[in-house]
Regions:
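Solvent-exposed, charged helical/coil patches
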Residues: 1-11
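Basic helix-extension-helix modules of the SAP/HeH family
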Residues: 5-6, 41, 52-55, 73-78
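Polyanion-binding surface elements
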Residues: 11-31
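Generic anion/oxyanion-binding catalytic loop in active/binding sites
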Residues: 12, 56-59
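Residues that form or flank phosphate/diphosphate-binding pockets in enzymes
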Residues: 18, 41, 65
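A short, structured beta-strand/loop element
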Residues: 29-54
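C-terminal structural segments of small proteins and small subunits
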Residues: 59-81
Length: 81
């Protein structure tokens, strides 16, 4: 099992110890690009054409609600493959 597959499994299990960089890696794999203000905010927005943007605070560990949001994206992307 590759490291990426392990990350996907952690997301599907709603792991409480997910880190921002791990979620970023998964979202970027599915074509989302990260943007944020030049300074002053810890929140980063991930965008993909034709999809709703998702905003995630860059704090660790990531709260469960944000992991759930990424889980929905992963499941949606897997259905479309």
């Amino acid at each position: 099992m590759s490291q990426f597959d392990k990350l996907l499994q952690q997301i599907k299990n709603l792991d409480r110890n997910m880190r921002f960089d791990e979620l970023r890696k998964v979202l970027e794999h599915y074509g989302y690009s990260m943007s944020g203000p030049a300074s002053g905010s810890s929140h980063k927005t991930f965008r993909k054409p034709g999809k709703y943007p998702i905003t995630i605070p860059q704090h660790e560990p990531i709260k469960r609600v944000y992991v759930e949001m990424v889980k929905e994206i992963v499941e949606s992307e897997e259905e479309n493959e």
